[in-house]
Amino acid sequence: MATTKSFLILIVMILATTSSTFASLEEMVTVLSIDGGGIKGIIPGTILEFLEGQLQKMDNNADARLADYFDVIGGTSTGGLLTAMITTPNENNRPFAAANEIVPFYFEHGPHIFNSSTGQFFRKYDGKYLMQVLQEKLGETRVHQALTEVAISSFDIKTNKPVIFTKSNLAKSPELDAKMYDICYSTAAAPTYFPPHYFATNTINGDKYELNLVDGAVATVADPALLSVSVATRRAQEDPAFASIRSLNYKKMLLLSLGTGTTSEFDKTHTAEETAKWGALQWMLVIQQMTEAASSYMTDYYLSTVFQDLHSQNNYLRVQENPLTGTTTKADDASEANMELLAQVGENLLKKPVSKDNPETYEEALKRFAKLLSDRKKLRANKASY
């Protein structure tokens, strides 16, 4: 009798634990962040194709798309373009691009976007083809129509302030309900590469609202993960679906951050004696790369530390190639040979360990992540059906 009673208690405990686990997963807020990096967007594009393919297999649904699984998708520069591609609706109110269309997009349009014959002395490219293809693909779609929350950064050079385009901010700032093609060009308009972008919208009172924007990396550097997280936490104050992460409860967050590779240049060491002899030109050649790489490392370090301190390290995954070499380091080398190399970098990255301390490969980690995303979606769908 005592044995039977103990067995029943054990069953109840298991059921209670399982129920708690499911409830916890259902409450999770999911965030995807995509770095900037020009043509190197092929690398996260390859990763996204793998992840979406896994979700389609798990849910036995060839029409499954990343926007169905993430509450917030954020990006800067080329990451902002990828964000728009997988969240902007087509005529059927589904993302106009599947993840497996991202890499072919770069191969088709990259050589025309980064065509040196269109450049001028003070910038490398005129940006006309980039704007043309953005208008063609994104049409008249505006921020409010995105299929999930987005976070795309840019920087206004007239006001010297970052401009962040999100759905949740439109109630307070309706003038930021801009056309997606204007936003995508702006976040990609890296100084010395493309011209800054001017356009105007209207305020709630009908007044003209002018924007003079450049690359989002000026505002958030290349890694927009903290921006994407902050958009999610801010939305938690108003949206019940995000309530679980109020008070910065990162235990209730799943964060996937995709990089475009670090450069070998940053791995070169310099001594104080050597750099003391440098002039402005020598510093200019390396300081931007050093600053961007250091900031990206610090973002990853901060997020890793926070999730580890909360014993939730499996809730955060940073996918990054360290380091790139040769032509793959260039943000604007859209030669077919280099794009093939970048695609191979992405494929090879899947087989590499997550870190020195974690032998799990990125492929295994992404499959685990996909399982969490799939299970969470099913739990929410079941709850909604009652």
Curated annotation (Swiss-Prot):
Principal subcellular localisation of the protein: other
Enzyme superclass (EC): hydrolase
Motif GXGXXG positions after renumbering to this chain: 36-41
GO cellular component: vacuole
Ranges in a coiled coil: 360-384
A Pfam cross-reference name: Patatin
Catalytic residues, chain numbering: 77 (nucleophile), 215 (proton acceptor)
MF term (GO), any: phospholipase activity
Tagged with keyword Cell division: no
Glycan attachment positions: 115
GO biological process: defense response; lipid catabolic process
Chain's role: Probable lipolytic acyl hydrolase (LAH), an activity which is thought to be involved in the response of tubers to pathogens.
Note: Patatin have a dual role as a somatic storage protein and as an enzyme involved in host resistance. This tuber protein represents approximately 40% of the total protein in mature tubers.
Record's protein name: Patatin-16
